[in-house]
């Protein structure tokens, strides 16, 4: 069963053991996608996991017979040039038997899910650019796209109390126990936003977008930084035993083919007359 699809990947549920299969469909060639998946698996484990540790969920590299999922994968790729589809297994971080199908809140940066009794609450965030020396990249981009979002994850790094503004903006009557736990987590110096910010800042000191003049200027550090500026964080609260679990996904190896898009967006934002500073 197809669970979700994005620009480059699809998520499949093939059994009922709480595991999803993440298949790359960027290219029409199965062989090309399989090669990327193998490289990406090594990249996640050798490059990203050492930076974020236990926040990266465990993954397994598997090969699925093409015939088993041809009815699904065939809609995304061309004629099969491989007898298998390479995939990464990952824990289902939003099981429908807990959260159902309904999204309780949804904007460009945040989604909220919860069960009917609010025993389980899941906040999915895309913090994006947490470090940018010249201006707030997230808020400036919001202005450019006319997105009316009154909170900013980059601001939460310097003012953790701002997390309350985000929660209030959702309009959800969260349990007090959840609010205390959630706000307390983001007040700690090792919360996931602080970690991502510090890594982004360190990588920016090596090479920033302003340094990129051509493809020859693109380094592994730059591509890693672009990966970390596009992750998703799943923060799940369970009433009993009043615990938070944080998982970071979408940590795929970025391809240099995106360079023109990144540079053009950066130029457009830098030339904006409506820059935002925090």
UniProtKB/Swiss-Prot annotation:
The UniProt entry's GO biological process terms, in alphabetical order, are: inositol phosphate biosynthetic process; nuclear-transcribed mRNA catabolic process, non-stop decay
Kindly report the protein's main subcellular placement as a broad class.
nucleus
Q: Which superkingdom does the taxonomy of this entry point to?
A: Eukaryota
Chemical reaction(s) catalysed: 1D-myo-inositol 1,3,4,5,6-pentakisphosphate + ATP = 1D-myo-inositol hexakisphosphate + ADP + H(+)
Is the keyword Transferase assigned to this protein? yes
Cellular component terms per the entry's GO annotation: nucleus
Q: What InterPro entries is this protein classified in?
A: Ins_P5_2-kin (IPR009286)
| Localization annotation | Nucleus
Q: Which UniProt keywords apply?
A: ATP-binding, Kinase, Nucleotide-binding, Nucleus, Transferase
Signal peptide limits: none
Q: Name one GO molecular function term.
A: ATP binding
Supply the EC number(s): 2.7.1.158
**Motif EXKPK motif positions after renumbering to this chain:** 124-128
- The answer on whether this UniProt entry bears the keyword Transferase reads yes
Q: What is known of its domains?
A: The EXKPK motif is conserved in inositol-pentakisphosphate 2-kinases of both family 1 and 2.
Which family does the UniProt entry place this protein in?
A: Belongs to the IPK1 type 1 family.
Q: What job does this protein perform?
A: Has kinase activity and phosphorylates inositol-1,3,4,5,6-pentakisphosphate (Ins(1,3,4,5,6)P5) to produce 1,2,3,4,5,6-hexakisphosphate (InsP6), also known as phytate.
Q: Kindly provide the name given to this protein in its UniProt entry.
A: Inositol-pentakisphosphate 2-kinase
What is this protein's gene name?
A: IPK1
């Amino acid at each position: 069963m197809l669970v979700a699809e994005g620009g480059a990947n699809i998520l499949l549920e093939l059994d009922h053991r709480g595991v999803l299969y993440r298949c790359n469909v960027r290219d029409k060639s199965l062989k090309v996608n399989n090669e990327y998946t193998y490289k990406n698996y090594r990249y996640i484990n050798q490059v990203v996991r050492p930076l974020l540790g236990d926040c990266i969920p465990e993954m397994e590299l598997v090969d699925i017979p093409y015939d088993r999922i041809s009815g699904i994968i065939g809609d995304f790729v061309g004629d099969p040039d491989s007898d298998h589809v390479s995939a990464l297994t990952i824990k289902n971080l939003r099981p429908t038997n807990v959260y159902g199908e309904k999204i309780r809140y949804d904007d460009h940066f945040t989604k909220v899910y919860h069960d009917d009794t609010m025993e389980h609450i899941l906040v999915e965030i895309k913090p994006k650019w947490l470090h940018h020396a010249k201006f707030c990249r997230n808020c400036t981009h919001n202005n450019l796209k006319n997105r009316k979002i009154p909170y900013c994850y980059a601001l939460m790094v310097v003012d953790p109390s701002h997390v309350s503004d985000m929660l209030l903006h959702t309009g959800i009557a969260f349990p007090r126990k959840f609010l205390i736990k959630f706000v307390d987590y983001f007040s700690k110096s090792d919360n996931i936003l602080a970690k991502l910010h510090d890594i982004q800042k360190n990588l920016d000191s090596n090479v920033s977008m302003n340094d990129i003049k051509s493809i020859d200027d693109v380094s592994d550090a730059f591509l890693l930084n672009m990966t970390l500026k596009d992750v998703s964080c799943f923060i799940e609260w369970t009433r009993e035993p009043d615990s938070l679990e944080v998982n970071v996904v979408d940590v795929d190896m970025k391809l240099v083919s995106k360079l023109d898009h990144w540079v053009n967006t950066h130029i457009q934002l830098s030339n904006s007359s409506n820059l935002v500073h925090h």
